Amino acid sequence: IRDQITNYFCYISGTKIEISPYNVNIRAFGSFSHAAHRILMSATTQDDSFFVKGLDFSPEAVKNPLRNMSPKWSGEKMLIIPSLVDDSCDHDLIVTEFCRIQTSKFGMIALVPSTKNCKQYQNLGAIITTAESIFEELDNLKKGEFSKIVVINNRYDGIDLPDESCRVLILDSLPYFDSLADRYEEQACPNSELINKRIAQKIEQGIGRGVRGEKDYCAILVIGSELVRFMRSIATNKFF
């Protein structure tokens, strides 16, 4: 940073300062930039331009990716929007009814975007995970220790909930961006297609948490007016 300070942005909020590059000098990392083979795998990539601008890949490599011409069945997801099934099945009803369940034969997970969104679940006795407890709670589910619904705060990737550990996944409310840089872009360009692609990518990542294999399956409930509107809008449903 010291040697290339002009290539960085600085964002300041009420709680933190964030410094991030707008032009990464990827060639400074020889083990990556000079590698004979570089393979990137993602199921949810929405913006291929990052590979060229951010990772210094050639446009030809991005235009001609390796393709699996015989993909396997990747599990089954049943996507349900309760508010479209019946007007009475609103956000509060879904949260309340699932929090009433004290024992279950399978894991139930709610993904929420912030601590604020956890409050209703917490008041109704759900298990709220923290940075310290999340992996212990997920291990309990994988061991078959099912009880109340488990709430995960702003973790749309990096966690696996296979088989019985998650048969019901509640995707609650529109995801937030983590970084100040992304939040600034969202506020400055609220209708940007690139921003909408990033939001859609987070949603897709969340949807994929409960199905991790070709024989896996999960019911996914989508609640929260902003999230439902985003997924159904003519301008944004093309990303799914």
PLM regions and their residue ranges:
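Short glycine-/polar-rich loops that comprise or flank the Walker A/P-loop
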Residues: 34-36, 74-77, 105-106, 163-167, ...
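Short active-site oxyanion
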Residues: 35-39, 104-109, 146-148
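Conserved RecA-like P-loop NTPase helicase motor core
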Residues: 84-87, 140-230
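Short, polar loop motifs at secondary-structure junctions
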Residues: 44-46, 113-117, 153-156
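A contiguous, basic/glycine-rich beta-loop/short-helix subdomain that forms a polymer-engagement track
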Residues: 1-92, 126-138, 152
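Short, basic/hydrophobic alpha-helical segments
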Residues: 92-103, 140
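Conserved strand-helix element at the start of the C-terminal RecA-like helicase core
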Residues: 101-123
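Short, low-complexity, polybasic intrinsically disordered segments
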Residues: 230-240
